[in-house]
C-alpha cells in the first residue's frame, strides 16, 4: 500500500466493479485512490464479517486513517469496517446505502421472488430497470447476466428463505450519505432515515437523477460532492494522484 493514500474505495463484487470506474477515474485526478475488492470462490461461503476481516488485514498495512467509501453492498462493508475499526477511518462516504445497510438490490430481488410468481429472468429484467433505468433490449440482457453473477458473489447472505439485517445507526467519524432522487432501491424517503443519526459535521446529498448507479451516469457531479466533503475534512490533494486496485479473496 502507498504511504500517501487518500481514499480507499470498497467494492463488493468483481462483476460490478466496472460501474465504479468513471467515478474513480474522475476523483483520481485530485486525490490518491485505491480500490479494494472483495472476492470469493463459488464453492466457499461468504459474509460481511469475512469481508471486514479481509479488509482489516489489508488496512493493517496503512499506518494512518484513510477516507473510506463504497456503493451499495460495498458501502455496507465499509460501514461495518468503520464501526469495528474507527481509528482506521478518517471519514466514511456511502453511496446508495440505506439506514438498514443490508437493504441492497439483492434484498429487493429476493422479496420479489417471494411475492410474485414470475421467473427469475423476469425479475432480474425488472431489476435492471430499477437500477439503470430503461435500456435497449440487448443492453438489458447483458445487465441481467451481470446481476445474475452478482447474486452469487455478494457477501450479503440473503436468500429466498431469509433476508438478513445489519446493525443500524451512525459512526464516530465524519459521514457523507449520497443517493439519487429516482433510485427505487434506496429512495429519497429511505435516505432521509439517516437523518436521525447524523452529526453536525455529517452531510446528506442527493443526485437529481441517475437511478441506483447514479455515480456511474454522473461521475463528475458525484465526484465533486465527494471531493468537497473530503477537503472539508482537511484532505490536501497530492501533487501526483493515481488510481490503484487491490483484490483480496477468502
Swiss-Prot record:
Gene3D superfamilies: alpha/beta hydrolase (3.40.50.1820). SUPFAM superfamilies: alpha/beta-Hydrolases. It comes from the Bacteria. InterPro entries: AB_hydrolase_fold, Thioesterase. GO terms for biological process: biosynthetic process. It holds the Pfam family Thioesterase. To Synechocystis PCC 6803 sll0249. This is Uncharacterized protein alr2406. It comes from Nostoc sp. (strain PCC 7120 / SAG 25.82 / UTEX 2576).
Amino acid at each position: 500500500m502507498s504511504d500517501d493514500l487518500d481514499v480507499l474505495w470498497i467494492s463488493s463484487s468483481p462483476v460490478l466493479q466496472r460501474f465504479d470506474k468513471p467515478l474513480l477515474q474522475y476523483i483520481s485526478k485530485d486525490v490518491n485512490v485505491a480500490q479494494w475488492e472483495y472476492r470469493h470462490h463459488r464453492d466457499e461461503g461468504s459474509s460481511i464479517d469475512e469481508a471486514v476481516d479481509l479488509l482489516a488485514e489489508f488496512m493493517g498495512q496503512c499506518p494512518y486513517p484513510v477516507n473510506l467509501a463504497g456503493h451499495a453492498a460495498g458501502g455496507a462493508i465499509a460501514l461495518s469496517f468503520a464501526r469495528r475499526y474507527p481509528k482506521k477511518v478518517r471519514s466514511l462516504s456511502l453511496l446508495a446505502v440505506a439506514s438498514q445497510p443490508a437493504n441492497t438490490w439483492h434484498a429487493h430481488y429476493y422479496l420479489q421472488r417471494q411475492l410474485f410468481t414470475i421467473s427469475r429472468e423476469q425479475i432480474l429484467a425488472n431489476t435492471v430497470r430499477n437500477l439503470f433505468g430503461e435500456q435497449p433490449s440487448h443492453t438489458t440482457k447483458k445487465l441481467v447476466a451481470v446481476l445474475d453473477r452478482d447474486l452469487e458473489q455478494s457477501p450479503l447472505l440473503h436468500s429466498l428463505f431469509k433476508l438478513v439485517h445489519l446493525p443500524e445507526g451512525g459512526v464516530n467519524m465524519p459521514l457523507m450519505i449520497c443517493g439519487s432522487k429516482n433510485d427505487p432501491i434506496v429512495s429519497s424517503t429511505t435516505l432521509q432515515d439517516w437523518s436521525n443519526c447524523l452529526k453536525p459535521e455529517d452531510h446528506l446529498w442527493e443526485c437529481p437523477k441517475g437511478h441506483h448507479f447514479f455515480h456511474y451516469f454522473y461521475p463528475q457531479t458525484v465526484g465533486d460532492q465527494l471531493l468537497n466533503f473530503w477537503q472539508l475534512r482537511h484532505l490536501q490533494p497530492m501533487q501526483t494522484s493515481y488510481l490503484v486496485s487491490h483484490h483480496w479473496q477468502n
